[in-house]
From Swiss-Prot:
Function: Catalyzes the NADPH-dependent reduction of L-glutamate 5-phosphate into L-glutamate 5-semialdehyde and phosphate. The product spontaneously undergoes cyclization to form 1-pyrroline-5-carboxylate.
Keyword Amino-acid biosynthesis listed: yes
Similarity comment: Belongs to the gamma-glutamyl phosphate reductase family.
Gene responsible for this protein: proA
EC number: 1.2.1.41
One Gene Ontology term, aspect cellular component: cytoplasm
Stored HAMAP family: ProA (MF_00412)
A single GO molecular function term of this UniProt record: glutamate-5-semialdehyde dehydrogenase activity
CDD domains per record: ALDH_F18-19_ProA-GPR (cd07079)
GO biological process, one term: L-proline biosynthetic process
Listed name of the protein: Gamma-glutamyl phosphate reductase
Catalytic activity as recorded in UniProt: L-glutamate 5-semialdehyde + phosphate + NADP(+) = L-glutamyl 5-phosphate + NADPH + H(+)
Pathway: Amino-acid biosynthesis; L-proline biosynthesis; L-glutamate 5-semialdehyde from L-glutamate: step 2/2
Source species: Shigella flexneri
Keywords: Amino-acid biosynthesis, Cytoplasm, NADP, Oxidoreductase, Proline biosynthesis
Length: 417
């Protein structure tokens, strides 16, 4: 089954690579319209997935990721329309010139070909990835989590109908609907057909892909994100950032999981933090230095376990650790961070500059929430993933990250001397 999907995707990629920007936008507009027109079918399928997932004990954080509402589905359709408005990187001449031989050489941006994406209970990913791949002339094979099988099937059917109505092959966007995990291992060896693989899931999935894949893999999406509260931070303003970073949507990978507090501000900061977190319903996981003081406040507090510094909670839980200084904070982030998103709250611009220079994450913030690490917020449109590695892409992966380049030499029957 997968080989036939690979063949279909590869053939479709040749067709997609020849489309003009106008033709690709026409397809995307059709997809957005059909997502809204067929919303009842998609929402009914999603309701069944959510009911099954709840019956099987899926966590509230994962249920939030899985669930679609009419407003969320409309937002997904609007995101597709936003992709239409983005500049098409395909065909862009990156650089070039005329060589001494007279050969005119240019480096031109082109599609990668076929993208494989493995992800969990995130139905919006199906549309986000498909729209970005189509905009860049790539075919895509999707393997969503078993929890979203009905939603993904309904969504991909809508996308394929839109493709066919525009005269394009359905093989441009395909989904593996069989939940058999053995198919993941088979997919990882499809280097004959898939040019790049993007796993969006937990550490176990990333490890599996790194160990078994014969396809180049872009890993990311695991966000053990930190905020360091420097001794010069403005407490009231810092709390606004922390509330946003923790509570706006706790189930996302750019949500803060560990708060590092400079010891010189702890006495005044921790009581205010406890009050704010109590109002926000956040459970604090405190180290020994912070525990007693936080227990005197209104927030729910437990003693942090050492392994929780490496946890991506994806819930209303927040580690709190007292650190001696900036060096101590940076050392903690280097030990426990996932190179996703980390922030410093400070009025000391020398400390801010050190933090920016020394924290090796894909996104580093000064006096801002980690929640900004997002393709839409960065002006990239929807994102395929947030890469936490350094090759071939880093940070939110928008359109340009789904392209490569080719060298083109144009001569007049030119030969090398």
């Amino acid at each position: 089954m997968l080989e036939q999907m690979g063949i279909a995707a590869k053939q479709a990629s040749y067709k997609l690579a020849q489309l003009s920007s106008r033709e690709k936008n026409r397809v995307l507009e059709k997809i957005a319209d059909e997502l809204e027109a067929q919303s009842e079918i998609i929402l009914n399928a999603n309701a069944q997935d959510v009911a099954d997932a709840r019956a099987n004990g899926l966590s509230e954080a994962m249920l939030d990721r899985l669930a679609l509402t009419p407003a969320r589905l409309k937002g997904i359709a609007d995101d597709v329309r936003q992709v239409c408005n983005l500049a098409d990187p395909v065909g862009q001449v990156i650089d070039g010139g005329v060589l001494d031989s007279g050969l005119r050489l240019e480096r031109r941006r082109v599609p990668l070909g076929v993208i494989g994406v493995i992800y969990e209970a995130r139905p919006n990913v199906t549309v986000d990835v498909a729209s970005l791949c189509l905009k860049t002339g790539n075919a895509v094979i999707l393997r969503g989590g078993k929890e979203t099988c009905r939603t993904n099937a309904a969504t991909v059917a809508v996308i394929q109908d839109a493709l066919k109505s525009c005269g394009l092959p359905a093989g441009a966007v395909q989904a593996i609907d069989n939940p058999d995990r053995a198919l993941v291992s088979e997919m990882l060896r499809m280097d004959k057909y898939i040019d790049m693989l993007i796993p969006r899931g937990g550490a176990g999935l990333h490890k599996l892909c790194r160990e078994q894949s014969t396809i180049p893999v872009i890993t990311g999406g695991i966000g053990v994100c930190h905020i360091y509260v420097d001794e010069s931070a403005e407490i009231a303003e810092a709390l606004k950032v922390i509330v946003n970073a923790k509570t706006q949507r706790p189930s996302t990978c750019n949500t803060v999981e560990t708060l590092l507090v400079n010891k010189n501000i702890a006495d005044s900061f921790l009581p205010a933090l406890s009050k704010q977190m109590a109002e926000s319903g956040v459970t604090l996981h405190a180290d020994a230095a912070a525990l007693t003081q936080l227990q005197a406040g209104p927030a729910k507090v437990v003693a942090v376990k050492a392994e929780e510094y490496d946890d991506e909670f994806l819930s209303l839980d927040l580690n709190v650790k007292i650190v001696s200084d900036l060096d101590d904070a940076i050392a903690h982030i280097r030990e426990h961070g996932t190179q996703h998103s980390d922030a410093i709250l400070t009025r000391d611009m020398r400390n801010a500059q050190r933090f920016v220079n020394e924290v090796d994450s894909s996104a580093v913030y000064v006096n801002a929430s980690t929640r900004f690490t997002d393709g839409g917020q960065f002006g990239l449109g929807a994102e395929v993933a947030v890469s936490t590695q350094k090759l071939h892409a880093r940070g939110p992966m928008g359109l340009e990250a789904l392209t490569t380049y080719k060298w083109i030499g144009i001569g007049d029957y030119t030969i090398r001397a």
